[in-house]
């Protein structure tokens, strides 16, 4: 998949980060809120013609979920 943009939801010492190349990291206290924001961001980018994959990591930094948002 050429041009696939990756959005990571990753743990921090005191919260969760949403990380996407070209954007400032977003920080949340709740993992659920970080995941929800990552999915909203992915949906917006997909509507703008960019394929996006959201990757969710747990506190141990294991990959626990992915979701693909194809370009619209």
Task: Give residue spans per PLM region.
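Short, solvent-exposed loop/turn motifs
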Residues: 24-25, 63
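Intrinsically disordered, low-complexity proline/glycine-rich segments
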Residues: 26-29, 57
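Short, mixed-charge low-complexity intrinsically disordered segments
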Residues: 47-72
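Short aromatic-glycine-(Arg/Gly/Cys) micro-motifs in beta-strand/loop hairpins
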Residues: 1-24
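Surface loops and adjacent helix of pleckstrin homology
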Residues: 21, 30-31, 68
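A short, charged, amphipathic alpha-helix used as a generic interaction element across diverse proteins
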Residues: 29-47
């Amino acid at each position: 998949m050429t041009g696939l943009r990756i959005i990571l939801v990753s743990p921090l010492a005191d919260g969760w980060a949403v990380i996407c190349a070209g954007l400032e990291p977003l920080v949340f206290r709740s993992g659920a809120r970080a995941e929800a924001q990552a999915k909203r961001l992915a949906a917006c980018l997909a509507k703008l013609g960019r394929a996006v994959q959201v990757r969710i990591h747990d506190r141990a930094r294991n990959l626990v979920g992915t979701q693909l948002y194809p370009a619209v």
